[in-house]
């Protein structure tokens, strides 16, 4: 079931032709120990986006063995996205905004570059402008009625917090985490240092505090002529804030769809921010507590929560008649395949 909070995105998805785009990139912020669990070690976070893309499209990873996992061994949310999209007829596309490791599958390259540590400037101005311009052109040339955009970038909630803070919001208090223990004090320290050194000009400030994925997703939404679904949590709220600064008229055709685990996250304040921005918000209401696998049941305890467009992918499946029961069965089956492949 899709639950609408602001607007009526559940109806807007029904019977529409859709493209699912996964935007990947990296930021050197993910190398800060303790800032993210989107990889077994800080160094392996550089492989996570490429591996997520490979698994989403092909069902296996080439840049690493197995699939991306947290330090606790919990698998990537790409599992949820791939299972959901396998049940419906939808075009899939991988977009490289600036990943240090690129996937060994076909992808669209925006000619960006990996994000730097935001304390020293996240994305160079000329690179940022190039990413946004190329993403906008790509968006303009996608012809379906609905564009669902997911993301994979470890430490993306920290760069999102920085962008939101730079735009006048209490960013660290707003954003979620892939861990049940949101490392807010570490995020706050990094964000405050980055904001102190950021330029005063609003656009240049965004570039300084952002990562390549935030900029690319904003560009895609600004170029696309139909309804853009930002499939993610608080990172997509930061994208919405960027769109509001750069192309405010586009917000009318933008909505966020996330997971219930983001909506229920008591360490974040997504709903409050989205209301302020004036963006539509819904979530895919899936319960994994009855899954066959402990690695999936832990989602109900606040692990991982969202990523690789999981909420939007599940919502697409639900809008096309897939029941929650069948979706859980498919996710379980894909998880079993992963386990068997590693034996």
From Swiss-Prot:
The molecular function GO annotations come to: nicotinate-nucleotide-dimethylbenzimidazole phosphoribosyltransferase activity
CDD domains, per the entry: DMB-PRT_CobT
Cystine pairs = none
* SUPFAM superfamilies given in the database record: Nicotinate mononucleotide:5,6-dimethylbenzimidazole phosphoribosyltransferase (CobT)
* Superkingdom to which the source organism belongs: Archaea
The UniProt family comment states: Belongs to the UPF0284 family.
Q: What is this protein called?
A: UPF0284 protein Msed_0735
Report the source organism: Metallosphaera sedula (strain ATCC 51363 / DSM 5348 / JCM 9185 / NBRC 15509 / TH2)
